[in-house]
Amino acid sequence: MGKLTLLLLALLVWLQYSLWFGKNGLHDYGRVNDDVTAQQATNAKLKARNDQLFAEIDDLNGGQEAIEERARNELSMTKPDETFYRLVPDASKRNQGSAQNNR
């Protein structure tokens, strides 16, 4: 009876070792858990971006104001009898500002 008990105990130890430290054990569980967390963070960023794009699409479909704003900003379009002024910062002030930032 002692040999059978020893054999069963050895089998139990081997099964427990393979369960905890073998394939699909604790190490794999931790790695997969980290992968899931990283994927959830990526999914959250992509969902926020999708929501923003859907809102922009709805805005473009719904009104002329968004289309006009986009045409003015991206294509520099103006209305008839409208004058476009571009304000360029003074180069000397720009150089002074960068010199102060470098200190």
Swiss-Prot record:
Task: State where it is primarily located.
Answer: membrane
* Periplasmic topological segments: 22-103
Spell out the coiled coil positions from the record.
33-62
What residues form the membrane-spanning segments? 4-21
Q: Does the keyword NAD apply?
A: no
What InterPro entries would the database entry show?
Cell_div_FtsB, FtsL/DivIC
- Gene3D superfamilies annotated for this entry? 1.20.5.400
Where in the cell is the protein located?
A: Cell inner membrane
Q: Which domain of life is it from?
A: Bacteria
Q: Any one cellular component term from GO for this entry?
A: cell septum
- Bilayer topology annotation: Single-pass type II membrane protein
Database matches in Pfam families: DivIC
Which ranges sit in the Cytoplasmic compartment? 1-3
Keyword Cell inner membrane assigned = yes
Swiss-Prot/TrEMBL keywords: Cell cycle, Cell division, Cell inner membrane, Cell membrane, Coiled coil, Membrane, Transmembrane, Transmembrane helix
Q: How does it assemble?
A: Part of a complex composed of FtsB, FtsL and FtsQ.
Question: What HAMAP family would the database entry show?
Answer: FtsB
- Biological function: Essential cell division protein. May link together the upstream cell division proteins, which are predominantly cytoplasmic, with the downstream cell division proteins, which are predominantly periplasmic.
Which named protein is this? Cell division protein FtsB
| Provenance organism | Enterobacter sp. (strain 638)
